[in-house]
From Swiss-Prot:
CDD domains: PT_UbiA_Cox10 (cd13957)
Note: Carbon 2 of the heme B porphyrin ring is defined according to the Fischer nomenclature.
Residue ranges crossing the lipid bilayer per the database entry: 17-37, 41-61, 91-111, 113-133, 141-161, 168-188, 207-227, 228-248, 266-286
Protein's name in the database: Protoheme IX farnesyltransferase
Function: Converts heme B (protoheme IX) to heme O by substitution of the vinyl group on carbon 2 of heme B porphyrin ring with a hydroxyethyl farnesyl side group.
Pfam families hit by this protein: UbiA
Bridged cysteine pairs (disulfide): none
The protein's Enzyme Commission number: 2.5.1.141
Length: 299
């Protein structure tokens, strides 16, 4: 009884999404200190736990708010709440617990600015996006993307406060521009389900042709924005080469979507690639930051 419940509670946390959030946050932490130094290990651990718990809390609240929608979509109807494996009250208590503990850790062991920014991001995703924007406007992903793009900034401020935060904003901008083509590709793949539950995703309100064009334009913009860390002398040639290669590959997927309007399989492949794109881009940022430095010293 207890073990299945724990498994279901963890399923509410969207652990794969949290892992990607944590990756971008930790890259922000390490880039916040100059090579060859490393950020304090205990600080990194505390910030990682706090940010992860807050992200998991936001995911739980997303499940609670979207319970009725999830029950009607084949992609989500096996989730714990629609299946009745977890009650609404249990989910709410779990979400509150994760949020309070996560924010408490950030306040006690990291710093106030990171706690405040994390709280704002949690509210932005769990309430402003999930409760209002998602159901109110086809630009829900664009506006709500600010909350999802915050983790690199949270990681940066956890280590360096506001010092050099303009560089963290470049990382924020990359994730912010990445978000629309990432989610719109999924929306094209699942457009009939979004129509069924009356969620005004862009393909539902403006049609597939318009959405394909927007994905293409945003992907071009993402390729350009991804070069900013190099242009700002934040990264070197390794990052530049990889960013261009990853961006061109993403653009090829966007062109395929544009040229194959009836093949939703391509949209799904684009969605999957976009996740790999972001992971590889941020790992490359970290590798480029340290690759010439041996041995490393603890900051």
């Amino acid at each position: 009884m207890i073990i299945p419940l724990i498994s279901d509670l963890l399923a509410l946390c969207k652990l794969k999404v949290v892992a990607l959030i944590l990756l971008t946050a930790e890259v922000g932490m390490f880039l916040a200190v100059p090579a060859p130094y490393l950020p304090n290990g205990l600080l990194v651990l505390s910030a990682s736990i706090g940010i992860s718990m807050a992200a998991a809390s936001a995911a739980v609240f997303n499940h609670v708010v979207d319970e009725q929608i999830d029950a009607q979509m084949s992609r989500t109807n096996k989730r714990p709440l629609p299946q009745g494996k977890v009650s609404r009250n249990q989910a709410l208590m779990w979400g509150v617990f994760l949020g309070l503990v996560g924010l408490g850790i950030l306040q006690l062991f990291v710093n106030t600015i990171t706690m405040v920014l994390t709280f704002v991001s949690l509210i932005g995703y769990a309430i402003i996006y999930t409760l209002y924007l998602k159901r109110a406007t086809p630009q829900n992903i664009v506006i709500g993307g600010a909350a999802g793009a915050a983790p690199p900034v949270l990681g940066w401020t956890a280590v360096s406060g506001t010092q050099g935060i303009e560089y963290a904003c470049l990382l924020f901008l990359i994730v912010f521009i990445w978000t629309p083509p990432h989610f719109w590709a999924l929306a094209i793949h699942r457009v009939e389900e979004y129509k069924k539950v009356d969620v005004p995703m862009l393909p539902v309100t403006h049609g597939l042709a318009y959405t394909r064009t927007q994905i293409l334009l945003y992907t071009v913009l993402l390729l350009l924005v991804s070069l900013l860390p190099y242009l700002a002398s934040m990264s070197g040639l390794i990052y530049l080469v990889v960013a261009i290669a990853l961006g061109i590959r993403f653009l090829m997927y966007a062109i395929k979507i544009y040229n194959n309007p009836d093949d939703k399989r391509i949209a799904w492949c684009t969605f999957v690639y976009s996740i790999n794109y972001l992971m590889l881009l941020f790992v490359t940022l970290l590798f480029d930051h340290y690759w010439l430095i041996l041995p490393l010293e603890v900051f």
